[in-house]
Curated annotation (Swiss-Prot):
Record note on modification: Palmitoleoylation is required for efficient binding to frizzled receptors. Depalmitoleoylation leads to Wnt signaling pathway inhibition.
GO biological process: anatomical structure formation involved in morphogenesis; animal organ morphogenesis; anterior/posterior axis specification; anterior/posterior pattern specification; axon guidance; canonical Wnt signaling pathway; cell-cell signaling; dorsal/ventral axis specification
Annotated source species: Mus musculus (Mouse)
Additional note from the record: Some mouse mammary tumors induced by mouse mammary tumor virus (MMTV) contain a provirus integrated into a host cell region which has been named Wnt3.
Keyword match Signal: yes
InterPro entries xrefs: Wnt, Wnt3, Wnt_C, Wnt_CS
Protein name, as recorded: Proto-oncogene Wnt-3
Family: Belongs to the Wnt family.
Localization, UniProt: Secreted, Extracellular space, Extracellular matrix; Secreted
Residues carrying sugar: N90, N301
Residue pairs linked by disulfide bridges in the UniProt entry: C80-C91, C131-C139, C141-C158, C206-C220, C208-C215, C284-C315, C300-C310, C314-C354, C330-C345, C332-C342, C337-C338
GO MF, any single term: signaling receptor binding
Cited Pfam families: wnt (PF00110)
Amino acid sequence: MEPHLLGLLLGLLLSGTRVLAGYPIWWSLALGQQYTSLASQPLLCGSIPGLVPKQLRFCRNYIEIMPSVAEGVKLGIQECQHQFRGRRWNCTTIDDSLAIFGPVLDKATRESAFVHAIASAGVAFAVTRSCAEGTSTICGCDSHHKGPPGEGWKWGGCSEDADFGVLVSREFADARENRPDARSAMNKHNNEAGRTTILDHMHLKCKCHGLSGSCEVKTCWWAQPDFRAIGDFLKDKYDSASEMVVEKHRESRGWVETLRAKYALFKPPTERDLVYYENSPNFCEPNPETGSFGTRDRTCNVTSHGIDGCDLLCCGRGHNTRTEKRKEKCHCVFHWCCYVSCQECIRIYDVHTCK
């Protein structure tokens, strides 16, 4: 590991006590192999770090679906890393830390908004899919078909019950967001935006039945989209996220913080928009306080004028170029019937990395 990254990682781990208060550390269950066996070992619920009492009760009462919750968080993290692969902050996780993103999400930034939304959506998505696959006895297919069949088709197959997946995500992910402060309000809003995206993207999927491929009978069912579509949509919402300001009100239970759109001339955010109220660091240099790993040694696109281009990704520091040899299949030929034969070629590529 490079010295500057080693120093940053040590700084993040040593500051762990402060970091843990920033966001749900139960997300770390996505990185633990032992949690895939939760369904057969209920006592593991007590070993999940960061669970509030309501989440612990949920885990023990609905132990069958907890592996899907873990899978959903993992799915959200993987999608975050895909969506931000060419950005200065690329959704880096720290495997041996309970705060898997480091201090980055301590602040109420756009990045925090996106991660909460995609993780919440991931839980809803994975639970819904697991129910449709029949891996749990407490859920299954959606028997409420949401309307009569259309002309030329009838209901069939297993409609995915996204309402149940959303309910699980809401009950579990929002359980800790019960404080009367601005950060809880922001987290709950963005969690719900992620879940709403799942519901909005449900679509009819159909299959034809008949002799010789004819479509004498067509059956349809409700299905979730590929999770990449959810990530793409929420990434667009990240780019257009609404900046908010914090307002304090005195109520019977004491002071309560709420969020209001910062710019009155703009359209206020809807339940489908992401919200934030603190500016992001520039992520150019390593910084243990902000959790930035910097962009040194990151691969950049020399032909791009976007954020993944060497000018922006490298923050004006310039870039290095090296050549790389790669073995690839080439000159492939299809043979009847039925296989493909290929030769192996050595190709030379230029690789550009930030200084």
